[in-house]
């Protein structure tokens, strides 16, 4: 490491995965599941160092003997003891960096409750002794990573989706929409519809297989009804998938029926509006003078926006809803799975950002509420 500048650490805490790395890098060094596992029957795990908790991939591989918990639900931290375990694992096992030596940039969900932001700040300064930290809204970082400061971000991950209108770098809270429908729901829906085909996936290990099928084979139809008709008349859309045990299964119209739920949440028994309508409603809540800039800069972010065909379909559906004179542009950056992290890496490397950090001195003077004055 160069002496001239201490590198900041960037940690994007998602419901499904933690993305962590060093500011200035173009991709996170570490991506691991946001899970903490504790032994089901403490004291009987022979030959294992008596650990009271396992984090990430290690928890995943030992899941047969553990009770797994996700401390981040729908984008919001709900279990602070487990969250602290995840951060500890991130610093010491994944990044192998001493937190007391680096400024730390954390990310938060849009509309994160005030108490949560204070708790994050407190844990960083008091448990990890960081010299400085900052909390940034995930969608804002995604927009930065696309090279924009104005636009609307549709951020859809594993636990939650949001539409976040941003003007000149600031999120507009009154117009943010949250949709509790994301990757985990789509994986569960795919399990259900594969069941109808006679493939029984039920355990948590099998759920991981279905997630892989989803990521490798699913796509979004431009016109759902036509795609259904086509799939009934030909077997062109059928693909085979080899299971870990060597068996091969065939996946047909499930390939596009699964992610269609993003546009038709009623498939999952949810009353919510689809992502196209949610984006449109979010824009409608904004001042009429900035709507043109939002319609022309609809930026996709998060792993659940990775489906082939999503850009074309969103463009089509939003064009149908919007005023006819409006130019609609959907931007789908290829690296959007990690664009929140990349935006954090960019932001924390800027020379102009260096005065934005909350320092240990400021924290000691003002306490956790300093986060509301410095991070917005």
From Swiss-Prot:
<dbReference type="InterPro" id="IPR004001">
    <property type="entry name" value="Actin_CS"/>
</dbReference>
<feature type="binding site">
    <location>
        <position position="215"/>
    </location>
    <ligand>
        <name>ATP</name>
    </ligand>
</feature>
<comment type="function">
    <text>Actin is a highly conserved protein that polymerizes to produce filaments that form cross-linked networks in the cytoplasm. Polymerizes into shorter and less stable actin filaments compared to ACT2/actin-2; this is thought to facilitate gliding motility and host cell invasion. Has ATPase activity. ATP hydrolysis leads to the formation of a stable intermediate ADP-inorganic phosphate (Pi) actin, which is followed by the release of Pi. ATP hydrolysis affects filament stability; ADP-bound actin depolymerizes much faster than ATP- or ADP-Pi-bound actin.</text>
</comment>
<keyword id="KW-0547">Nucleotide-binding</keyword>
<feature type="binding site">
    <location>
        <position position="19"/>
    </location>
    <ligand>
        <name>ATP</name>
    </ligand>
</feature>
<keyword id="KW-0067">ATP-binding</keyword>
<dbReference type="Pfam" id="PF00022">
    <property type="entry name" value="Actin"/>
</dbReference>
<feature type="binding site">
    <location>
        <position position="17"/>
    </location>
    <ligand>
        <name>ATP</name>
    </ligand>
</feature>
<keyword id="KW-0206">Cytoskeleton</keyword>
<keyword id="KW-0539">Nucleus</keyword>
<feature type="binding site">
    <location>
        <position position="16"/>
    </location>
    <ligand>
        <name>ATP</name>
    </ligand>
</feature>
<feature type="region of interest" description="DNAseI-binding D loop; regulates polymerization and stability of the actin filament">
    <location>
        <begin position="40"/>
        <end position="61"/>
    </location>
</feature>
<dbReference type="InterPro" id="IPR020902">
    <property type="entry name" value="Actin/actin-like_CS"/>
</dbReference>
<feature type="binding site">
    <location>
        <position position="303"/>
    </location>
    <ligand>
        <name>ATP</name>
    </ligand>
</feature>
<dbReference type="GO" id="GO:0016887">
    <property type="term" value="F:ATP hydrolysis activity"/>
</dbReference>
<dbReference type="InterPro" id="IPR004000">
    <property type="entry name" value="Actin"/>
</dbReference>
<comment type="subunit">
    <text>Monomer (G-actin). Oligomer (F-actin). Polymerization of globular actin (G-actin) leads to a structural filament (F-actin) in the form of a two-stranded helix. Unlike for mammalian monomeric actin, parasite monomeric actin is able to induce oligomerization in the presence of ATP or ADP. Mg(2+), which is used to coordinate ATP, is required for polymerization. Interacts with MyoA. Interacts with DNase I with low affinity.</text>
</comment>
<comment type="similarity">
    <text>Belongs to the actin family.</text>
</comment>
<feature type="binding site">
    <location>
        <position position="214"/>
    </location>
    <ligand>
        <name>ATP</name>
    </ligand>
</feature>
<keyword id="KW-0378">Hydrolase</keyword>
<dbReference type="GO" id="GO:0005524">
    <property type="term" value="F:ATP binding"/>
</dbReference>
<dbReference type="InterPro" id="IPR043129">
    <property type="entry name" value="ATPase_NBD"/>
</dbReference>
<feature type="binding site">
    <location>
        <position position="160"/>
    </location>
    <ligand>
        <name>ATP</name>
    </ligand>
</feature>
<dbReference type="GO" id="GO:0005856">
    <property type="term" value="C:cytoskeleton"/>
</dbReference>
<feature type="binding site">
    <location>
        <position position="158"/>
    </location>
    <ligand>
        <name>ATP</name>
    </ligand>
</feature>
<feature type="binding site">
    <location>
        <position position="15"/>
    </location>
    <ligand>
        <name>ATP</name>
    </ligand>
</feature>
<protein>
    <recommendedName>
        <fullName>Actin-1</fullName>
        <ecNumber>3.6.4.-</ecNumber>
    </recommendedName>
</protein>
<dbReference type="GO" id="GO:0005737">
    <property type="term" value="C:cytoplasm"/>
</dbReference>
<feature type="binding site">
    <location>
        <position position="159"/>
    </location>
    <ligand>
        <name>ATP</name>
    </ligand>
</feature>
<keyword id="KW-0963">Cytoplasm</keyword>
<dbReference type="GO" id="GO:0005634">
    <property type="term" value="C:nucleus"/>
</dbReference>
